[in-house]
Amino acid sequence: MPRARVHVIPTSAPDDMSGLQTLIEEKNLDPARLVAILGKTEGNGCVNDFTRAFSVAAIQRVLGNATENVALVMSGGTEGGLSPHLVTFEALDETGNGPSMAMGATITRDLSPSEIGTFTQVECVAEAVRSAVRSALISDSDDVHFVQIKCPLLTSDRIATSDAPTVTNDTLKSMGLSRGASSLGVALGLG
């Protein structure tokens, strides 16, 4: 089976990329092999949490064009026992004997505001999951143990400029509807 490499990198601020830069400089991380970067920022985790986009912009400055096909998923809010960090995922060309961690990723087309939280989103996510499973060279969906989704939500601007009615005019409620549609898409994609 294909193999993967994961690094957990503590950060001191949404734009702190020193740990990521060190891994690259010391040749312990190859940006060309990145599949995804997940992160936790100090933000509030709500619709207006700017720290997610701030962190993504900082990652893009460090990695440049290498982020073009990399899923960048930031989650705001580090209350309680959580601390800010990045988790990098690389797909390696190596194979191992027996089971190992394999990764695949797909980035869907941008959904229109009127598609967020609808069956169109469910179908789009389902196809993306199937594509990611194929790219990970996994032949049996029973071997899939985790699917990470970055799902869109409605903002006031997206609602106001939508060419068609949206499922809700409540930006906070759109988070739940989008997550629900994405979750159903994962289930449909895995059978």
Model-found features: residue ranges?
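Terminal domain-initiation and capping elements
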Residues: M1-G191
